[in-house]
């Protein structure tokens, strides 16, 4: 597991392991014996998510929600595989992303057009569909109750039109996914972002 952080109040975070360290994070919110997972990374991240659950004393059966900030594959590519391992979980996703998680062929086609099919297969593996009845669409101001702990989903288009942020009302913590466009430290010039 990469860069494990216990933030207190049942909030844990760790690196997804996607491409390089500190590029994308996965979070657990634990309330009593129940858990919500925010973002999944790619299929390669799923074993680390399961290990994280076990680290906090929970099994895959304890997961009530897998919440995606958006459906880009660095944040959502492992959702289908994770949902197979978490039989009680519902997937929470922006309404614009829900159909792509139930039937990911157009999503895979679009990513393959940008990066190439070989790269997509190598980095993301097989993207698994999620049964529509396990998907909860989360338009602006949707409240998800995790063992009576309220998680507010807010529509935050910008990085993607299908992007949400999640506010844990108990701690006032916000889980932002990707809030900006692309910016990589390798492209910094004189200590400032080039793009």
Residue ranges and their predicted role:
Residues 2-56, 166-176:
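Conserved beta-strand hairpin/beta-sheet module of binuclear metal-dependent hydrolase folds
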Residues 19-22, 136-138, 157-160:
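A short catalytic or substrate-binding loop motif that flags glycine-/basic-rich loops and adjacent residues
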Residues 38-41, 64-70, 92-94, 156-158, ...:
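Active-site neighborhood of phospho(di)ester-bond hydrolases with catalytic His/Asp-centered motifs
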Residues 44, 101-155, 161-195:
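Metallo-beta-lactamase
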Residues 47-93:
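Active-site metal-binding motif and surrounding structural segment of the metallo-beta-lactamase
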Residues 96-100:
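Short histidine/acidic/glycine/proline-rich micro-motifs that form metal-
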């Amino acid at each position: 597991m990469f860069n494990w952080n216990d933030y207190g109040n049942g909030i844990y975070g760790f690196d997804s392991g996607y491409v390089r360290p500190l590029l994308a994070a996965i979070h657990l919110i634990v309330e009593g014996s129940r858990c919500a997972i925010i973002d999944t990374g790619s299929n390669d991240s799923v074993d680390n998510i399961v290990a994280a659950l076990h680290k906090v004393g929970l099994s895959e059966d304890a997961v009530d929600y897998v919440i995606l900030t958006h459906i880009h594959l660095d944040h959502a590519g492992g959702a289908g595989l994770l949902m197979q391992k978490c039989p009680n979980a519902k997937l929470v996703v922006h309404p614009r992303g829900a159909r792509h998680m139930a039937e990911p062929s157009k999503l895979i086609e679009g990513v393959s057009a940008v990066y190439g099919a070989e790269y997509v297969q190598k980095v993301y593996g097989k993207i698994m569909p999620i049964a529509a009845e396990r998907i909860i669409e989360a338009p602006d101001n949707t409240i998800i109750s995790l063992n009576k702990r309220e998680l507010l989903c807010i529509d935050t288009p910008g990085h993607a039109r299908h992007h949400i942020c999640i506010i844990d009302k108990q701690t006032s913590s916000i889980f932002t996914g990707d809030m900006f466009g692309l910016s990589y430290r390798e492209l910094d010039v004189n200590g400032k972002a080039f793009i």
